[in-house]
Amino acid sequence: MAKKSLIEREKKRKILVQKYKFIRQSLKNEIKDASSLEEILAIHKELQSLPRNSAPTRLHRRCFLTGRPRSNYRDFGLSRHVLREMAHTCLLPGVTKSSW
């Protein structure tokens, strides 16, 4: 189980990303449409003034149940350990153990 402070930090980042999503996107579109270098630099400065954690690249996928940051499956939102346990107990519909 991951530290609760790290899980809460990720939750705050998700909220910030959602809050500044449209502002960040509009500024990026303005940069594409800008004609002069001064305009681009001014808009870029506004973009840099946004909170650092509002950038979507700072988000990290974590396991929905345990908060484990590594080896997550995107389809399920679970780490490999939890996925294996849940698959063995038939809690994931449609997931079967492969054999050949």
Swiss-Prot record:
Described purpose of this protein according to its UniProt entry: Binds 16S rRNA, required for the assembly of 30S particles.
Family recorded in the similarity comment: Belongs to the universal ribosomal protein uS14 family.
Pfam family, one: Ribosomal_S14
Keyword Glycoprotein: no
Quaternary assembly: Part of the 30S ribosomal subunit.
InterPro entries xrefs: Ribosomal_uS14 (IPR001209), Ribosomal_uS14_bac/plastid (IPR023036), Ribosomal_uS14_CS (IPR018271)
Keywords from the UniProt entry: Chloroplast, Plastid, Ribonucleoprotein, Ribosomal protein, RNA-binding, rRNA-binding
UniProt xrefs under HAMAP family: Ribosomal_uS14_1
GO cellular component: chloroplast; small ribosomal subunit
GO MF annotation terms: rRNA binding; structural constituent of ribosome
Name of the featured protein: Small ribosomal subunit protein uS14c
Subcellular location: Plastid, Chloroplast
Example GO BP: translation
